[in-house]
Amino acid sequence: MNKYWTLVLLLSILVVLALTFYFFTPLLDGIVMGVVFAYVAKPVKRKIEHVGRIKASVIATAIVILPISVLMFYGLIQGLNQAIYLITHYKVIESGILNILSKMGIEEGEEYVKWITSNVFSILQSSIQPSAVEITKKATLLILNFFISIVVCFYALADMENFVRRTTSVVPEDRRDEFRRFVEEIDVTFESLWFGNFVVAILIGLVSLPFFLYFNVPFAPLLSGLMFLAALIPIFAEWMIILPVSLYLLLVDVGRGLSFLLIGVVFLYVLPELILRPYFVGYTSKIHPLVLMLAFIGGGLVGGISGFFIAPMIVGLATAIYNYYTKEELATENHDPESV
């Protein structure tokens, strides 16, 4: 009879967990981002913890979230304005393309270019109108997830230690120290992973500013901030800044556009994403650079925004488990009298 009720209890817990996951799935991006932001803000909270747990959590959350929110919303507004301008003023792009062709010595095909641009922009205008509701839904969900990430970040900073303490009290007493050390290993790995990733994003944003200024790109400080924001999501996101800027410079001056594209790809993408980030973050979190790079790429392809963060965390969890048990084995060998 006891076994029957134990089975019913386990099944009930599984059903509740499955339903919870199902209802939380649309908000998964916000929850995961909130956890990541909490690990980024954790070193800040540790420095100011003397002011109190709640106050330190609020300040640390604000220090991390405020710059990101300002850059994200201002970037979205500017991007929307520029997209509307391009769609309604496609003649400017058309004349820019014709200017590029004339500089390259290609005089033929003017009517063909005009026909292509007019058709492309008419298709864009007609396709945007029916999908306006869908775009509004996605934008609303994005904003909602971002605000959820702020709330999750704050509560993760404020209450995570209490949660771990209560969870530890459920563990059998003879295993509590082992469980506590295991949780600490995971915590250190995740903190090193996401704080290191945040530092690399800041470096990419700072390094991009001289490039934008050198090539006389408008809104250079804003674009540098957006590069930092894009670099928070590794491997893919920088292209959302590099390609539009390259296209703009190509319309202004072909040589400048090609030079920026080449230099931008090498110094703002290949070097930081394929060399600096994997090695730096791998060094701080003790995760192998190749495994980390594959986790970022695979997670993004499979799970979108949340996948970018969940896959490296799974790899980080596996690394923490490996590091913990290798440390335990080494400690056991050192204390073994027969090994002396």
From Swiss-Prot:
Statement: the UniProt record of this protein carries the keyword Transmembrane: yes
Pfam family, one: AI-2E_transport
Topological type in the membrane: Multi-pass membrane protein
Subcellular location field: Cell membrane
GO CC annotation: plasma membrane
Residue spans crossing the bilayer: 7-27, 57-77, 140-160, 193-213, 225-245, 260-280, 290-310
Keywords for this protein: Cell membrane, Membrane, Transmembrane, Transmembrane helix, Transport
Positions of disulphide bridges: none
Main location: membrane
Superkingdom: Archaea
Family: Belongs to the autoinducer-2 exporter (AI-2E) (TC 2.A.86) family.
Name of the protein: Putative transport protein AF_1800
The organism of origin for this protein: Archaeoglobus fulgidus (strain ATCC 49558 / DSM 4304 / JCM 9628 / NBRC 100126 / VC-16)
